[in-house]
Structure formats: structure tokens, C-alpha cells
Amino acid sequence: MQKSLIAASVCAVLAALSMPSQACFTVVVGKDASSTGEILVGHNEDNDRRIITNQYWVPAATHKAGEMIEFEASAAKIPQVEKTFGFWWTQTLSPDGYSFSDGFINENGVVVVSNNCNVTIEEKETFNEGGIGYGIRRIVAERAKSARDGVNIAIDLQKKYGYFHMGRTYTIADRNEAWQIVLMRGHRYVARRVADNEVAFLANAISFDKLDFKDTKNVLASPDIIEHAIEKGAYKPAKAGDYSDFSFRKAYQPEARRVLPRNKERVFTLLEMLTGREYKDVNDYPAALVVEKKISPQQVQSFMRGHSKFEKRLSGWYHETMQDICNIGTFDSVVYQLGADPKLTVVWRSAGRPSEQLYTPSFPLAGPAAAQSYMDPATATLAQFHATAQQLDYSADRAIYTFLAAQNFIDWMPEERAKFENVQKAFEVQAFKDVGEARANAARLMKVSETKALDYMHGFNVRYYDAALGEAAKVVNAANTHAIAVTKDALSKSDAGTVDVVLFAAKDFDATKLDPKKTFFGSPYPDGSIELNKEMAKPAKVVFKDVDGDGLEDAVITFPVKGATALTVEGVLNELYLFTVVDGKPTAAFETVRITK
């Protein structure tokens, strides 16, 4: 009976996951568990379909009386405070507008990231005035003086407006402490402070198990959190009046959420990396562990690059599903070293999947390089839920697309992956040395002039970003050596016909040795379940003929338009990739095509 109930719950969870979803993975290392004595926060932002990440510095601001905060069209309108802090904003720009993906660190060194933990018993709870979603993270970034202050701000907003998403865990951290707070649809919440000697970890299921609700220094919760679970039939104490066996995650979330492969495998991968022990039981671990050996920032980077040993990888691509910590939907990865002086905080960021990108150091309070965005913060804020086609267009002048192209080639071409891993190791060894020296120099300058120190750190940010961009460009230049041509200037999503794609031959490249069974054409972005685009077009026909008159036979590959345009965005200039194998060697190329209705 228990197995059938779990199976039914799994079906319900999978049905929920068929909608556009956001996932993520987070690791928090307490300062006493950290080799640097700093709180470390690692976070992978995992999303579906076409996502463009940009980095902004939003300056501190003074606001007019009566100003209202408006984000999602249906959400509550919230009064703005007089003064807001400056913050680094990682935007995940989506055609549909994302409420739950952006990351922040403000001028006080307060970090905000989150993990989707939906499917809870609170699905029918109500909220006020449309409730709050995106506003939680943005308002905490704007107003929080500390991590604890950020938690209190989130709780106050939850009480007043209520959360409109079914469930999510926010990690809010600063140089002194790290908190994780679960917000559920309606007005209930549970927050837990990560102990200084712990490593906390979280995929996409509620992690809090048994909590000491009397320990109000480290645990904060809605007053009726246990009684409500009893009323809902989600919890029955073994002994009446004795709540010592109360497990928050078991009461408020179906076990099916934790046993989903995408959730359990990522947690098990992290646990094995931490302990050397193989885990199999989803109820056999706490929300955090005390570790014997201190954890370094480099180790947190390796955690965020974690891959499941059970992933089969049979499709030709390295990343296929969400069972890896670093997976097909990882659009942004960060590791924060939260310094005693927030201005000297270091963040390591990859502009995509961290196993296929470089972790690049920067001092976030000194601001990003101009090339890390292509809009100003005010325009980007307006675009958050109203992005135009032009704002989502591919452009070689937008640096983010070079990083995305590099990882697309690396993912399909094992030879490029092997070469890149050597570059990655050398780059990051040097980066740790350089950022240590830069941090020491900035601390010296800070004693003379804060402005000079910030200018120095901003220069470091720009140079290291440019260096990482240069390495990504080298990958693209080395891998993207074969020309393709899509024979239509635009493709319609409603077209039931076909389109020809020409793969041109060269003196050292025999296109007639193309393997049709290992050839695909379409969008490289993940689907709505954060898995490989399985709708990508396969050849309907392949003809070899000399298209360009150079005496060499080119491959003219006919693809169904429906598959070629799957997961593309209407009105947008999309990049479409040809993934194939020629003479036994994985090969890829791309062209841009405007997609119409």
C-alpha cells in the first residue's frame, strides 16, 4: 500500500514538473567549517528553455513618498521605503518572466539565492492582494542590513501578503551567519540558521527534518506549524501531545518529491563527495552535516561541478538530465567567499554550466564589467516580466552568447571537453593566486581611500572577465570550424514542412561521411522539465552534392521544421545548432534564424 501511494505521488509530482520549472542546488559552509574562516555559499541556478543571464550593479537610491513596487502583473503592489541599498543583481531574463531565479548580493554583503521546493500540503492556501513572489528576493536585497534582518524582512512580507508559489527555500547569508527559510503558499514559513560548524545542502525538496522550535536564536517558524500539519492530516504524533517525532519535511511535502531522481541523485552525489559514503535512503540524512575536515572554496566549486555516477550519457551529449548537480539547465553558478569586510567579498562565477565554464573571480561590491550586460539596470528591471524579442535576440556582440556557444560545443565534442579541462585547471589555479594578491592590495588601499580600492577591484573584475571571455572565444574558434547554411531566412513554428541545412565540405573535411543516425538540428536549450531537447529535428533526408561550386560534395540535410523550431521563441533571433558525427568524429556548427508564428 505504501509503495502504491508513493507511486501515485510520484505521478502527481511529475505532472507538476511538466510545467515550466526552476530547480537549483545550494551548498552553505559555516565559517568554522570553512578553510578560510569565511561563510561559503555555492549555488547553481538551474532553469528551463531560453534564459539569458546578465550582471548589473544597481546603485543605492532614495525614493519618493508614495512610490509602489510592482513586479508580476498579478502580484501585490508594495510600498517602497525611502532608501534602498546598492546591490549586484544576476538577472535570468526569460521570455515569460521569471519570479524565482535571480541572485543578489547587496552592499552590506547580504546574499540571496533560492531553490524550488514546490509540491507541498499548502497548495490551497490563500494570500492577500495577489501575494508576493519575485518581491521577496529583490526587497531583501534592497533593504537587508544583515542575513538575520533579511530573514525578518521575508517573514514580515510573508505574514502581510503571503507567498503565491507552492514552496521555496531561500538562502540568505552574510559574513556572520547563514539562514535558510522555507516559504510556502499562503503565510507559513520555517527558517533555520546554518550552524558555524555545518555544511548545509539543498536540491529541490524541503531539507529541514526535526527542528527545535524552542531554540528561537536558530529556528523561526509560524506559531501553528505543527498544529496545522495535524489539522491537515499530514502529521500524527506517536504519543498525544508529544511532538518530538515531528519532521517538517515529512509533514509538509510528499516523499515523492525527495525520491525523484533529479532531487535524490544530486543530494546523494554531494553527500558522497563530502563523506566518501554512498547514500541510498532519502530519509537517511539531515539538512546539514558536521564535517571533520574544513572545506575550501575550491572544494565548493568541485561540489557545484558534481556529476552523478549513475547518469548513463548515451545521447551523445554529456549533459542530458537534471540528475547532475551541474546539469543541462545550469545557466549560472556562483561560489561566495563572504569576507569580514563586505567590500572584500569574493565571488566566483561561471556564465553557464561550471564543468564547461571557468569560475571567474570578482569583487561584487566593485561592480561587474560593462560587457556582463547589454542593458542598463532600469531597462533590465522593466524587462524582467516584459522582455521584448530584441532583448532576447542572439547577438555576437552580447558576450554571454560566446560563453553559451562554448559550452554547447564542449558538451557535444569530447575532444574539446578534454582540452578545456586542462585550460580550466590552469586558469583557476592562477586565479586563486591572483585574487588573493588583489584582495590584500585592496585592503591596503581601503585604509587610504575607499574609492581607490573600489576602482582597483573593479579593474580586476574587468580584466578577469575579459580573460574568461577570451578562453570561451578560443573554444568557439577551435570547435566552430565548419560552415552551415539554413536555406530559409526565417522559420515558422506552424510550418508542417521541411527545411534544408547545408553542411559544407572542405579539403580536410569530407561531408559525405556524415552519420544521419547521429545528426540533430535545433535549439540547444533544455526543455520545460530541464532535460535535453528531445524534440530536436532528425534528418528526413540527406543528399550529397556540390552546393558552393568548389568541387567537393556538401551534405544537404532535410529536417522537419517542427523539430527545428522546438523550444525556440517566436519573434526572436534564435541560434540553431547542427549536432552531427562525421567520419566518426562529433562535429557541431550553428546559425541564427528568426522564428515566426
Region spans (language model):
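Histidine-centered catalytic/metal-binding microenvironments
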Residues: 412-479
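N-terminal signal peptide c-region/cleavage motif recognized by signal peptidases
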Residues: 18-20
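A contiguous strand-loop segment
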Residues: 24-133, 153-280, 286-288, 292
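Substrate-recognition/cap regions that form aromatic- and gly/pro-loop-enriched pockets
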Residues: 312-440
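Acidic, glycine-anchored loop motifs typical of Ca2+
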Residues: 528, 543-559, 565, 571
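Boundary/junction segments of secreted and surface-exposed precursor proteins
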Residues: 23, 479-504
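Short, surface-exposed alpha-helix to beta-strand junction/turn motifs within ectodomains of secreted
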Residues: 511-536
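A short beta-turn/strand-edge loop motif at beta-sheet boundaries
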Residues: 494-495, 507-515
